[in-house]
Structure formats: structure tokens, C-alpha cells
């Protein structure tokens, strides 16, 4: 029995890796994505342009302008000469945001009065503008604290911020663990969804059906190669993250690969379900992308799940990518134990049992 199963698994791997183009498809996209995504898919604001309209030209407004210019988020500073330039600057997207110093700004600061600043953001790029505004607020806050040194303070408390699990708040530390889930999802879904459709197109499905193999053996034989491919791709991303991006892996490799197998099995159910419903590889390929786009959007990678409407948050519970993304980040960055990741692991087990049973039933009805 196991010899037959191993023969089928080996046959699936050989048919998958026979052509150089197929091997390249399984490796090159992984390398390209893990190199490009940490730099391109980031919410950090860099190389932005800030506009300054200074009606004060006093000591404090000039000092703050210089500090804004030295910030790493802003590489260009536009100094406006009249209020008439404000609207065209924002309308033509010459600047992401604009700071306006009133005429009495420095005088009020020297007399310890409240000195307001006007900050105008480009709402067409609301996310980046809001992040840049937070940078400016931090700069202003730090300058305010410097002015208060040696002066009577309302209290003696001080807020000390420590960033756990990502000390430098490097966005790559968020992207790379999430990429493990994204890339392995694509690998598993493509391998499993195209497997049965490829057999139909090549005319080898009938030969497989008349073989001594049982239904569950064929089912497992189609699933195991996808798990092997997913594990291999995850290992590539993990190695690049550790040695190329210097992101330390804090957790247990055994726990990581255990949850990786559970996650792969949950995706195998989706993939074989798509493969059983499709007659051609083209249909299966389209089915994969119909699944992938909503799954990625609802995974918490693009935007936090907590920011979604409640009904959409409830819908994300059936999305395996959401749970494995949480598991990967907790194991990778936090050295989480099985007790901690269990809250995300048990939904994966439920999804695995549900999709696996549905795919097996559909596989028997449509294929056998």
C-alpha cells in the first residue's frame, strides 16, 4: 500500500519538476517576491516632499523647518512665499503635506503661550499623509520637550517607549514573516489545483483511475507534493529573511514546520476542490486567483483585521491565510509556544477538516 502511494507521489513530483520552465516557476517568483516586497510593499513614508509657508520667520519656526528637512521621511522641502501658493501646491501634488507657521508663532513660544500650527494634508493619499503627519507631530513634540527643559513642569512623569519584538520598527520585520504565508499559499494552490486538470488534459487520468490505487491514495498522492513544494518555498523565504535581511528567528523550527504542514493541508483542500470542479488548467488557474485575491485582502496583510467592519472580521475566520500569518509572526518574532499560537491553530484545524472532507467528497464524485 505504501509502496503504491510512494510511487504516485514520486510520479507527481517527476511530472511537476520534469520541465525546466516549471522548476523556474516554483523558484524564481519566490526569489523575486522576497527581494522586492520588503522594499516595495511598505507603509513607511520615505522620499516625500513637504511644503513650508512661514509667516513668522522667527527662531522657533526656522528651527522646526530645519528639523523637518532633516527627517528621513522628507527628501524635498518647498518654501512657499505667499498664501496663494498653498492650494496649487497641494492640488498639483507637489507636496504630500504643508505646514503653515502663523506670524506670532515664535513670540508665543517665547512667552510660554499656546502656539498653533496649521497642517494641511493631501487627502488623495490619506494613508501616507497621515503617517507623515505623525512624524511631524513627533518632531514638534520633541522640540516642545526641549523648550520645557529647566522650566517648571506640570508633573514629573515621563513616557518611555520600548518596542518589543521589532526594536527599530523596521517594516521588513513585518513583511518577511507575512511573505512566508503569501508565497506558500500560491505554491500550494497552483500545484494542487492544476494537478487533476493536467491529468485530464494529458489523458492520463483514466490510466490513474484503473490503477490499483484507491481514492484516498490518489487524494493523498496529489496532496503530498504540494506540501513538499510549500515547505521548500517557506524554507527559502525563511533563509533569506534570516541571513539576507538579518531578521532573527526567535522561535522553534519544529513548531514552525508543524504549523506549516497544518496550513498546507488546509490549502490542499481548497486546491483539490478547485481542481475537481475545473476541466482545464486554464479554468483551475482562474479559480486560484478568484480565491487568492479576497483571501489576501482579508488576511490582515494589506490592512489590520481590527480595522475592518465587524461582519467582515467574522468572515476572516474562514480564511486560512489570516491564521497562518498570525502564527508565523508570533513564532518568528516572539518565540511563541504552542499554547500561545493555539488560538490561531485550532481554526486552521477546523478549516483543514472541513475543506479536506469537502474536497475528498467532490474528488470522489467528480473524478472517480
From Swiss-Prot:
- An example of a Pfam family matching this protein is ABC2_membrane_3
UniProt membrane topology term: Multi-pass membrane protein
Q: What induces it?
A: Repressed by the transcriptional regulator CecR.
Task: Give the UniProt subcellular location, in the record's own words.
Answer: Cell inner membrane
Which stretches face the Cytoplasmic side? Answer: 1-24, 195-222, 275-284, 361-368
**Bilayer-crossing regions:** 25-45, 174-194, 223-243, 254-274, 285-305, 340-360
Q: Which terms in the Gene Ontology molecular function aspect does this entry carry? A: ABC-type transporter activity; efflux transmembrane transporter activity
Keyword list (alphabetical) reads: Cell inner membrane, Cell membrane, Membrane, Transmembrane, Transmembrane helix, Transport
Q: Which Gene Ontology cellular component terms are annotated?
A: ATP-binding cassette (ABC) transporter complex, substrate-binding subunit-containing; plasma membrane
Q: Which domain of life is it from?
A: Bacteria
Periplasmic domain ranges by topology: 46-173, 244-253, 306-339
- What residue stretches are annotated with the ABC transmembrane type-2 domain? 129-366
Q: Name one GO biological process term.
A: tetracycline transmembrane transport
The protein's job, in short, is:
Part of the ABC transporter complex YbhFSR that could be involved in efflux of cefoperazone. Probably involved in the translocation of the substrate across the membrane.
Q: Which family does it belong to?
A: Belongs to the ABC-2 integral membrane protein family.
Q: How does it assemble?
A: The complex is probably composed of two ATP-binding proteins (YbhF) and two transmembrane proteins (YbhR and YbhS).
Name of this protein? Probable multidrug ABC transporter permease YbhR
Q: Which organism is it from?
A: Escherichia coli (strain K12)
Amino acid at each position: 500500500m505504501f509502496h503504491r502511494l510512494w510511487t504516485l507521489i514520486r510520479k507527481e513530483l517527476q511530472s511537476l519538476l520534469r520541465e525546466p520552465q516549471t522548476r523556474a516557476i516554483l523558484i524564481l517568483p519566490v526569489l523575486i517576491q522576497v527581494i522586492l516586497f520588503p522594499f516595495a510593499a511598505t507603509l513607511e513614508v520615505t522620499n516625500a516632499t513637504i511644503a513650508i509657508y512661514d509667516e513668522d520667520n522667527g527662531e522657533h519656526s526656522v528651527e522646526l523647518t530645519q528639523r523637518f528637512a532633516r527627517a528621513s521621511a522628507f527628501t524635498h522641502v518647498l518654501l512657499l512665499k505667499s498664501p496663494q501658493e498653498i492650494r496649487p501646491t497641494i492640488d498639483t501634488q507637489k507636496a504630500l503635506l504643508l505646514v503653515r507657521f502663523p506670524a506670532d508663532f515664535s513670540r508665543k513660544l517665547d512667552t510660554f503661550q499656546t502656539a498653533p500650527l496649521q497642517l494641511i494634508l493631501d487627502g488623495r493619499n490619506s494613508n501616507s499623509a497621515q503617517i507623515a503627519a505623525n512624524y511631524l507631530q513627533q518632531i514638534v513634540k520633541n522640540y516642545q520637550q526641549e523648550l520645557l527643559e529647566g522650566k517648571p513642569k506640570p508633573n514629573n512623569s515621563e513616557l518611555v517607549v520600548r518596542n518589543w519584538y521589532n526594536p527599530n520598527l523596521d517594516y521588513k520585520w513585518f513583511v518577511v514573516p507575512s511573505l512566508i504565508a503569501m508565497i506558500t499559499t500560491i505554491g500550494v494552490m497552483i500545484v494542487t489545483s492544476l494537478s487533476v486538470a493536467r491529468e485530464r488534459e494529458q489523458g492520463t487520468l483514466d490510466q490513474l483511475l484503473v490503477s490499483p490505487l484507491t481514492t484516498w491514495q490518489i487524494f493523498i498522492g496529489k496532496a503530498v507534493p504540494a506540501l513538499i513544494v510549500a515547505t521548500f518555498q517557506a524554507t527559502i523565504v525563511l533563509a533569506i529573511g534570516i541571513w539576507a535581511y538579518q531578521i532573527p528567528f526567535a522561535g522553534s523550527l519544529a513548531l514552525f514546520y508543524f504549523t506549516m504542514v497544518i496550513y498546507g493541508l488546509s490549502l490542499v483542500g481548497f486546491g483539490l476542490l478547485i481542481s475537481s470542479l475545473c476541466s482545464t488548467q486554464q479554468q483551475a488557474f482562474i479559480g486560484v486567483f478568484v480565491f487568492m485575491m479576497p483571501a489576501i485582502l482579508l488576511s490582515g496583510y494589506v490592512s489590520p483585521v481590527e480595522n475592518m467592519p465587524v461582519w467582515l472580521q467574522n468572515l476572516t475566520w474562514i480564511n486560512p491565510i489570516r491564521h497562518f500569518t498570525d502564527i508565523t509572526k508570533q513564532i518568528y518574532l516572539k518565540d511563541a509556544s504552542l499554547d500561545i499560537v493555539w488560538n490561531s491553530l485550532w481554526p486552521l484545524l477546523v478549516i483543514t477538516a472541513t475543506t479536506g472532507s469537502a474536497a475528498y467528497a467532490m474528488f470522489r464524485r467528480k473524478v472517480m
